[in-house]
Amino acid sequence: MEKIGVIVTAGGAGRRFGGEKPKQFLELSGIPVIIITLKRMVNLPIVGQVVLTVPENYIEVAGDLLSRYNLAGIKLTAGGTTRRESVLRGIRALTGNFSIIAVHDGVRPFFPKGALSEGVKKLSEGYGGAILAVPLRDTVKEVKDNVVISTLDRSRLYAVQTPQIFRREALLKGHALGEKQHLDAVDDSILVELCGETVAVIPGDYKNLKITWPEDLEFAEFLFTRYFAKELL
């Protein structure tokens, strides 16, 4: 089995979440969110190396957590001022010459365990990348100044998740473009798309929550206790 490199991004300051510390260091049943994510990731046979990016002022905190939870094999690096910069720093920190690289949000601890393997299968079919996505369940309106402008065709709209899996050369090409044009990309697939690569979609999971707002933490606690705690406790 070909091993892949994984970048886990936890470089955000969590301004939308509020509180004294970034959301990735908050706990579910006493375990930091980022540790749950990393524990589940490193246990996958397909993963050859994991690089974790965190805010520079949290390097020491993150290092202590990795040691405490027996994750010292994970390489730690400081994130940049944007997500794109953080991912690029993570790519550069990989020591293995991986032909496939996955990028994952550190605050998505409940990713499907088969996602990476499914993504690799898509790449073998000639795609430059593969992303997880789920169909939108709600009607979506375009709104300006609190007035509806249009109703979008929900059947064609998907909510994108991570991990996202890419051929190394496609991801590097995308980030080179992003760096050159100073693009503030919301995810990595858009950079790969802008380079002319085709990105495949594989089924995501509605439980693959990105912890962004304070109310997400309560729901994440429920999901962890109900579905995922047995993997770690």
Swiss-Prot record:
Keywords for this protein: Isoprene biosynthesis, Nucleotidyltransferase, Transferase
Pfam families on file: IspD (PF01128)
Encoding gene (name): ispD
Source organism of the structure: Carboxydothermus hydrogenoformans (strain ATCC BAA-161 / DSM 6008 / Z-2901)
Protein name per UniProt: 2-C-methyl-D-erythritol 4-phosphate cytidylyltransferase
Positions marked as site (Positions MEP for the nucleophilic attack): 154, 210
Pathway: Isoprenoid biosynthesis; isopentenyl diphosphate biosynthesis via DXP pathway; isopentenyl diphosphate from 1-deoxy-D-xylulose 5-phosphate: step 2/6
Keyword Plastid: no
Enzyme class: transferase
Transition state stabilizer (site feature) positions: 16, 23
GO MF annotations, alphabetized: 2-C-methyl-D-erythritol 4-phosphate cytidylyltransferase activity
Family recorded in the similarity comment: Belongs to the IspD/TarI cytidylyltransferase family. IspD subfamily.
Chemical reaction(s) catalysed: 2-C-methyl-D-erythritol 4-phosphate + CTP + H(+) = 4-CDP-2-C-methyl-D-erythritol + diphosphate
